[in-house]
Design a protein with these regions (language model features):
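Nucleotide/phosphate-binding catalytic cleft detector across ATP-hydrolyzing
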Residues: 1-160
């Protein structure tokens, strides 16, 4: 069965954030399966684990695969909230992402293409099961735009200098 879900991800320099999860932007890659009880994903022949040693600042997070893999971690963490997902389900993910307003004009299209990829189905094996994920649509927005819209009236009253 094809299931459509929207999972928003904020790719911070310190933390990855979803509606329900926050974790450090840190990743370990290894060839061997991790010890029992460790949270991991197995993707394209490699095991990935989260770490506390964060990735140094990257203005452009599309330079290598690390932030893509961290995004898969974020998606999987959110999918664990849906017990009705069956192993044979294909999950079409709409992925809203936030970009710093300062970088939005330069990186918006690049980020959308990077995270959408080739629109293929990614098989992600975790300690808890297997997911088949297709990142169907990616929409980049300036970070904090939605939060700002909730107080726009107050912002308009602030004197400009």
């Amino acid at each position: 069965m094809i299931r459509k879900l929207r999972i928003a991800v904020d790719h911070g320099n310190k933390n990855m954030k979803t509606c329900n999860q926050v974790f450090t932007t840190a990743l370990i890659t290894q060839d061997k399966k991790p010890a029992r009880g460790e949270e991991y994903i197995f993707y394209e022949g490699k095991y990935y684990l989260l770490s506390n040693r964060r990735i140094p600042y990257q203005r452009d997070k599309t330079e290598d695969e690390r932030f893509f893999v961290l995004t898969l971690f974020a998606i999987v963490k959110e999918l664990k909230k849906y017990p009705q997902i069956a192993p044979e389900d294909v999950l079409q993910i709409n992925l809203p992402i936030g970009l710093p307003p300062k970088h939005f004009a330069d990186l918006c299209e690049k980020y959308e293409c990077y995270f959408k990829g080739e629109n293929k189905v990614h098989e992600i094996i975790t300690e808890g099961g297997t997911y088949h994920v297709a990142i169907h649509d990616v929409m980049a927005f300036p970070q904090d735009y939605a939060a700002m819209m909730t107080v726009i009236d107050k912002l308009q009253d602030i004197p400009k200098s």
